[in-house]
């Protein structure tokens, strides 16, 4: 089947590209907008969840014929286990044998590699947490018209066009260093708790102690409302600490924190509020628009889609 993709040009290549809506963002958008829609290639796992044909280790899943259990890239194998033919060569041969390939040839092209391991990177669909920006894009677009931009073309053009087609914001980042997502879920993801303050977290830990999911409260010595440095020595909200905190559902089942951290741009956007400890202090400065919005901002044009957008 052939579908339209506006990111394909006649300037480079053939003007035709293969599409993998399961693994590529542009491919997914093109497949989603096609009529009828081209669904991503997903199959149910042993728990009934829809998963791609490739697992998180870069191997094809079981029960899909000749490619089952094989790595997508030869570089993923241990040195003494690298097969003579890579999986793409095996597939090409099979397509030729079945007379399903119009043409097969080798060519060199660039491919993203991990800077640490020097191995090929595999794009993979992951579960993430989003801010539903698409519900707010029209309001943001209209509010942007009230800003006195200099030059005006930046506000109406570059930034205005960005807001008009703003996508939902993926907050999740699969890293270690950063602000942990304050979201806890039970094993089957039927119940979530989103923590909005240190006080709320301390209270939830105390509830978990009653259910037997926590033995003690690591932040018991922290005094809510005490802003002295010595008090903040009694609390540590980094990932390696909060990942050990088990909260409890309404029925007492354990809940673990979502493993990801928050996109650093979210922190940047929180600056006007966080710098004055809003909403825990100085509420009038924000609620009565004394400190925010700003009267004047001078910033590089690159930050219109970065910090200023957040």
What do these predicted ranges mean?
Residues 1-310:
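Non-cofactor substrate-recognition interfaces
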């Amino acid at each position: 089947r052939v579908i339209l993709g506006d990111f394909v040009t006649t300037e480079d290549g053939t003007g035709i590209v293969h599409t993998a809506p399961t693994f590529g963002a542009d491919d997914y958008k093109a497949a989603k907008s096609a009529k009828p829609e081209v669904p991503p290639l997903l199959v149910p796992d042993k728990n009934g969840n829809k998963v791609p044909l490739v697992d998180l280790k870069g191997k094809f899943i079981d029960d899909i014929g000749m490619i089952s259990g094989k790595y997508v890239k030869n570089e993923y194998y241990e040195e003494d286990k690298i097969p003579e033919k890579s999986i793409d060569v095996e597939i090409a041969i099979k397509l030729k044998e079945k007379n399903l390939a119009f043409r097969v040839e080798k060519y060199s092209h660039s491919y993203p590699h991990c800077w640490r391991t020097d191995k090929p990177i595999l794009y993979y669909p992951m579960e993430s947490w989003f801010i539903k920006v698409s519900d707010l894009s029209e309001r943001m677009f209209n509010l942007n018209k009230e800003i006195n931009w200099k030059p005006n073309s930046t506000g109406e053009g570059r930034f205005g066009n960005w807001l008009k087609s703003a996508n939902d914001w993926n907050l999740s980042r699969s890293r270690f260093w950063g602000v942990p997502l304050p979201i806890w879920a039970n094993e089957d993801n039927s119940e979530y708790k989103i923590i909005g303050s240190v006080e709320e977290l301390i209270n939830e830990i105390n509830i978990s102690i009653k259910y037997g999911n926590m033995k003690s409260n690591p932040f018991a010595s922290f005094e809510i409302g005490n802003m002295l440095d010595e008090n903040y020595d009694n609390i540590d909200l980094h990932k390696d600490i909060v990942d050990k905190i088990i909260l409890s559902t309404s029925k007492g089942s354990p809940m673990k924190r979502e493993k990801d951290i928050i996109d650093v741009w979210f922190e940047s956007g929180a600056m006007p509020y966080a710098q004055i400890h809003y909403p825990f202090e100085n509420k009038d400065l924000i609620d009565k628009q004394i400190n925010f919005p700003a009267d004047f901002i001078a910033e590089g044009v690159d930050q219109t889609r970065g910090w200023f957008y957040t």
